[in-house]
Every structure is written in structure tokens, then in C-alpha cells.
Amino acid sequence: MHIVKLNITGKEVGSEEFFEFTNYYFQSLYGTKQIINEEWQYEPIDNGLSLNLFCPEKDSYSEKNSTIYGIKWKKRIEGELKCKFDFRYMGLDPEFGKTIIPKKRDFLILKTARFSPIIEGSSLNQIPLYKIPYTHHDGECYNDINFWENNYERVEGLWFNGIVGERWAQNQLQNHDSDLSKQGIDCCKKIEEVTQIPTYYFLFNYRAWGQKKDKERKCPRCGNDWLIDGSTFNDFYAFKCDDCRLISELSSNR
């Protein structure tokens, strides 16, 4: 992960409109995974503000990777507010290290992950959204994936915290016909349509029914065998149905 320092200068820096416009701008960059920090902390500099952007590639932030919405907000900040942008490359993030974005893509998996919900199935490396064609119905962004990802993270958080809605949340995460899974499966279909790469939806699994029964379970949609021989609960996925485009894991709740 690369750190890029952005300095924004101008008389309108710090105004109400400035923070409104920059908020929309950075939200757009986050929605495409051009940056991975969902929150941004400003530091004062002469005649402006500075902040660090965390990017999958050195130039992830550039307009060539932006949606029309990201470009629009940047131009409004520059044009209406007369502000200047200065991007400076700082180096690799010591925590993340170098991000590997696979060029060869055997198949894709939709699953929430560290910075992008699209995972290459063989290498298990994540692919920023801006690396694939737009998936939203307006043909200009990835809002469909963003909305699903937001829902998934909130449901997952509800399950993880327990007590309040835990069973409902677990069913949403692990059942293929839940509202959450249906939303994600629709995203998978669209991703496969625009990329022409098989795209699978990841089904969470935390069933407490023992390893033997867990390994015997069939694809929940078609009922066919889908266990990958030799899989363990340490594997990222242990079940794969090519017909239904579903992938799942062995339960660690043994």
C-alpha cells in the first residue's frame, strides 16, 4: 500500500464549502478503492491543509481511475474554490507493505476484505474496483457493490458483537437466499457480465454441527457435491459450485 501526501492550498481552504466538496471527492475515491482510508485527517500547512492518502498503486488517486463524480468534485474544488492540489509520493505503508494486484484472473470472489471486496480466486489477492468496468446501472460507478459492501460490514458487525440480532445476522451471512446474499449475488452477476470472468459469491459458514456433517453438506442452491478434496477450515474456501457460482468455507465452530 502506497502513501501519497496531498496538500490542498487556497483562500477557501477550511470553509464550509471546502469541507463539503472534499468530503464528496474523497468518498468518490474510496468508492472506487483509489484510496482505502474511509476517514481522513487534515493537518494545517501554510495557506492550506495536508492529509495522507493510502493507495493500492502509486497513481491510484489519478483522474484516469476516477469516476465522473470524483472528477466533478475535484474540478469544483479547483474551479469554484480556486484551490490547488499537490500530490506527493511518500513511499510504502510499513503496515501493509506492497500491494500485489493480479493481472491474471482465473475467477473472482465477492467477499469483504481488507481494502477491496473483489478477490482473485487463485492468488487470493484483492483487486481495486477501479480495475474493472463500472457495474452500477448508471454505467458510471460501483454503487451497487458499495451498497452491498456497506450492508455486509454492518450485518457482520452485528453478528460479531452478539446478543442483538446475532442469529438473524448469521443467517444473512451464510444463507444463499437471504436478502444480503441475493444483493451480493446480483453484484456477482454484473461483475461477471462486465469482466467476462467467472465470479463467485462467498457464503460465510459458522455452523456448529461438527466437521463430518459440515464436509457432507451440498451446494445449498442445486444440491450437488461442492466440497474441494483435502480442504481444511484453515483454507480461504473449501466449497465451490461452478454451476451456481457459490463459494464457502468449512466452519471453524467445531
Regions found by a protein language model. Give the residues of each.
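Domain-scale terminal segments
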Residues: M1-Q170, I197
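Surface-exposed cleft-lining segments at the edges of enzyme active sites
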Residues: Q170-H176
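Cys/His-clustered metal-coordination modules, chiefly Zn-binding fingers
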Residues: S178-R254
